Amino acid sequence: MESLASLYKNHIATLQERTRDALARFKLDALLIHSGELFNVFLDDHPYPFKVNPQFKAWVPVTQVPNCWLLVDGVNKPKLWFYLPVDYWHNVEPLPTSFWTEDVEVIALPKADGIGSLLPAARGNIGYIGPVPERALQLGIEASNINPKGVIDYLHYYRSFKTEYELACMREAQKMAVNGHRAAEEAFRSGMSEFDINIAYLTATGHRDTDVPYSNIVALNEHASVLHYTKLDHQAPEEMRSFLLDAGAEYNGYAADLTRTWSAKSDNDYAQLVKDVNDEQLALIATMKAGVSYVDYHIQFHQRIAKLLRKHQIITDMSEEAMVENDLTGPFMPHGIGHPLGLQVHDVAGFMQDDSGTHLAAPAKYPYLRCTRILQPGMVLTIEPGIYFIESLLAPWREGQFSKHFNWQKIEALKPFGGIRIEDNVVIHENNVENMTRDLKLA
């Protein structure tokens, strides 16, 4: 495999080219990209956990250091002012020397407010990208050049197409997340609580709970019906029935986002339904290719959901086509088939149709779908279908003409298991689709 250093060199060349194009299009001289700042909790002297500006970590794998600045113009070597205070109260990260530092000019910044004297004197034509607009104004950046929409749309659109460096980082994040999922399943099988399963996951991945790319969803039994369940009960339930784990990892700022569901017993209806959702997810991925709308795959999976609802006699006396047409599959899979993945878990530009930011919304029937793009080589997406038993979504169907088609007795029997979700991370290539998750033998 090509070294990360050489992949990074090509990655920087790609970002430089995108920057040149963006600056020319929007008549700017350079971009000043801010890592961000610490923000204190209201009426407290304690800061919230730091989350770096994703446009900053696109350039350098510096994810834990506030008050850093990047100046890029697409021509000269990117210049990084790295915050390096003299501080005996807090940990101070050393000036980086790593695989990437040959391609970036790294300069120590001893004071957070010292950047003003180090920037070019003429700043009227510099664009600022970052979370603190008032800081940009203090530095003399024109208000119209603070997070300019056209520039950000342009950069976001091309972030959809991952460089080989980015894909290498995402494969490493997959390895970490897969280790976590294996440890979590073992913890579940040994009877641990959600809280303790989460600790096992974090230990296996080498993350703190503030470092994972999103809050882990560790859901036992009926908790699996809450799509973004993050409570973490300290007490294990008396009876273990099911376990849904939606948890990722991060490597050099790039995310993995995996979900698996396990049945405590292997010989019940729920276990068979888990197997069938898994099989249908793999079957859908096997059909994927460049040049097809992501929306089409979402719609296709509703047809697969209908097949499973019929097979398991959850919906009866109705054709699969009629189920989809009348949205009887909707309450069972209320979310989208997945989303773009990269520097952010729900990565940007899922609805952008071009580099001008033209927006194509999700279909009215499926408002929670997060991507309407035509799949193209270099894109990374999640494929995460599910079937859930959520009373608030099922309740409206208990009345009316379609109620008789719902096997309410079967649904009541499955509700204590919560739901099922299976999620892999895939890369679209010219002639194939790479399943980064299954390549690591995560069943």
Swiss-Prot record:
Alphabetized CDD domains for the sequence: Prolidase
Q: Which SUPFAM superfamilies match?
A: Creatinase/aminopeptidase
Q: Does the keyword Hydrolase apply?
A: yes
UniProtKB keywords: Dipeptidase, Hydrolase, Manganese, Metal-binding, Metalloprotease, Protease
> For Mn(2+) 2, which residues are the binding ones?
D246, D257, E423
What Enzyme Commission number(s) apply to this enzyme?
A: 3.4.13.9
User: How is this protein annotated for GO cellular component?
Assistant: cytosol
Q: Which cysteines are joined by disulfide bonds?
A: none
Q: Which Pfam families match?
A: PepQ_N (PF21216), Peptidase_M24 (PF00557)
Q: Tell me the residue numbers annotated for binding Mn(2+) 1.
A: D257, H339, E384, E423
Q: How is the cofactor bound?
A: Binds 2 manganese ions per subunit.
Tell me the leader sequence span.
none
State the reactions this protein catalyses.
Answer: Xaa-L-Pro dipeptide + H2O = an L-alpha-amino acid + L-proline
Cofactor(s) for this UniProt protein: Mn(2+)
Report whether Hydrolase shows up as a keyword of the record: yes
Q: Name one GO biological process term.
A: proteolysis
* Superkingdom in the source lineage: Bacteria
Per the similarity annotation, which family is this? Belongs to the peptidase M24B family. Bacterial-type prolidase subfamily.
Checking PANTHER family in the record gives: XAA-PRO AMINOPEPTIDASE 3 (PTHR43226), XAA-PRO DIPEPTIDASE (PTHR43226:SF8)
Q: What does this protein do?
A: Splits dipeptides with a prolyl residue in the C-terminal position.
The entry's protein name is Xaa-Pro dipeptidase
Species of provenance: Shigella sonnei (strain Ss046)
The top of its lineage is:
Bacteria, Pseudomonadati, Pseudomonadota, Gammaproteobacteria, Enterobacterales
Gene behind the chain: pepQ
